[in-house]
Amino acid sequence: MKRLGHVPIHKGDFHLLPPKVQRFVAEKAELMRPRGIYICDGSQHEADEIIDKLIERGMLSPLKAYENNYICRTDPKDVARVESKTWMVTPDKYQTVCHTPDGIEPIMGHWMSPDSLATELDSRFPGCMAGRIMYVIPFSMGPVGGPLSKIGVQLTDSNYVVLSMRIMTRVGHEVWDALGDNDFVRCIHSVGLPRPVKQRVINHWPCNPERVLIAHRPAEREIWSFGSGYGGNSLLGKKMLALRIASNIAKDEGWMAEHMLIMGVTRPDGKEHFIAAAFPSACGKTNLAMLEPALPGWKVRCVGDDIAWMKFGEDGRLYAINPEYGFFGVAPGTSKKTNPMAVATFQKNSIFTNVGETANGEYFWEGLEDEIKDKNVDMINWLGEKWRIGDPGLCAHPNSRFAAPASQCPIIHPEWESPKGVPIDAIIFGGRRPAGVPLVFETRSWLHGIFTGACLKSEATAAAEHKGKTVMHDPMAMRPFMGYNFGHYLQHWIDLNKDGRKVPKIYHVNWFRRDANNKFLWPGYGQNIRVIDWIVRRLDGEPDIGVDTPIGIVPKKGAINASGLPDIQWDELMSVPKEYWTNDAKEIRKFLEEQVGPDLPKEIRAEMDAQEERINKQA
């Protein structure tokens, strides 16, 4: 067997790797001291081999009702992204965070000094892979070799990560060819539990929750993740590379890396528009990306459901690619009623984490009660306990996930892997706003749209560790994923609007407004096509369908196609209540002054002043 120093190479030819990758692998093998090295090739044979090993070990079990679907339960302490332990590391603190006043904790960006990082890494990574295999995963974000694509190499000691990365990114030999001796994003991941293990491993899921650390070094294009196997912390191509590191690269190179879905919407007359939309986690990005239109003649096709990399083309239009290869979706609430296309996507070749399992070998989670054939079937919940519908507690963890290949989505767009991307006509921001915010409004300009995105708020969700129903700020839906100083990020958006460029129109939507009895005012889901229809008509210049308000243009009464809808309280749904917005404006000013302070671009401050003035003048 070939060796690298003392370490046997179980698979792959080390000497065929690009020289920079060889140095990276050798250096980290010396640091983490695995018992062997395994260079992944992304083949089906490799996946089958790893799946068999994990089934034998008890970490995965097949869901017998489907073809090649597997379920896995994690340690109950390792179930979500850990924002409090996720850091950006820059020599100057203010490259990462804004200049906030004394006593105000920045909510965007979480800074650590390079010296502190060195200490933290030194206390974790030496010898951390003892007794485990180090897998080397070459992966491409975006089509291999595409002009907008980026290559990463992830080292990990988790086979769950190897299996998930081949669904979520493009893994394979061709990545090495595309890389050559160019630079790549260095991704180092360990579950942080060297063998012999001194503590009890729960659910055959090694992790080290007390010692979790996720650190990004943007200047070095490097990511370190320790102690967690959960996807949001361990699949380093996802939020870490595709948003936190990519937003830094994008700032340097003049493009955008955003937390947005990309959808193609075709009108009944055959004209297609592409829309990117930013919603905080668990506000329905995946549902909108795979919308099943309730209006006849409309067609929606999905390019991506979570991340958009966008760059202006030679023709002045903004082109977007989905850098991912799969969907990593929240399972609870996903059903044939709420998202039939997602359900169709994960009928095979998918991995389910922390969901329930029925005695018939099917998955189960909250939201599937009406769709399950046998309501009395015995189940095992996400904690591995016996469970039945009607029992107390939840069957699936609220942040349980499916990982499914995007190519299996029945409405995946034929251009979803186009290397140059699709041209974006509109950007939508949205969040869960129970009060005060109309169903949809169009912003006044690119700058007013940036201001509106900076003010994005939403009720907190399961994807992060926050609890309770508080409405939280989530600017541009990027709060947990900001890769650098948010004031500089806003300035970057402003600077992108150069002469000769056609910037998209920017909209804000709110599917979640409630009436006095706490009932939703809007039916949502497939009916959201009616809002998209209004947006598209605005894009196409249809006259007389909008009304000016202090916050932007809302649909004129009767402008939204209501055929076949039950009674909707249109006035309440579209209203812009003066008292609400007067208070909101004060709250937004306080937020931007405290959180962005002197880093707030003057153009955005001017937008804030102008909007306050419009609200105060409102009758």
UniProtKB/Swiss-Prot annotation:
One of its GO terms (biological process) is propionate catabolic process. SUPFAM superfamilies: PEP carboxykinase N-terminal domain, PEP carboxykinase-like. Pfam families: PEPCK_GTP, PEPCK_N. Its cofactor is Mn(2+). Substrate binds at residues 81, 230-232, 281, 399-401. Its EC number is 4.1.1.32. The keyword Manganese applies. It is an enzyme of class 4 (lyase). GTP binds at residues 282-287, 401, 432, 525-528. GO terms for cellular component: cytosol. One of its GO terms (molecular function) is phosphoenolpyruvate carboxykinase (GTP) activity. Binds 1 Mn(2+) ion per subunit. Monomer. Belongs to the phosphoenolpyruvate carboxykinase [GTP] family. PANTHER family: PHOSPHOENOLPYRUVATE CARBOXYKINASE, PHOSPHOENOLPYRUVATE CARBOXYKINASE (GTP). In parasitic nematodes PEPCK carboxylates phosphoenolpyruvate to oxaloacetate thus introducing the products of glycolysis to mitochondrial metabolism. This is Phosphoenolpyruvate carboxykinase [GTP]. It comes from Haemonchus contortus. The gene is PEPCK.
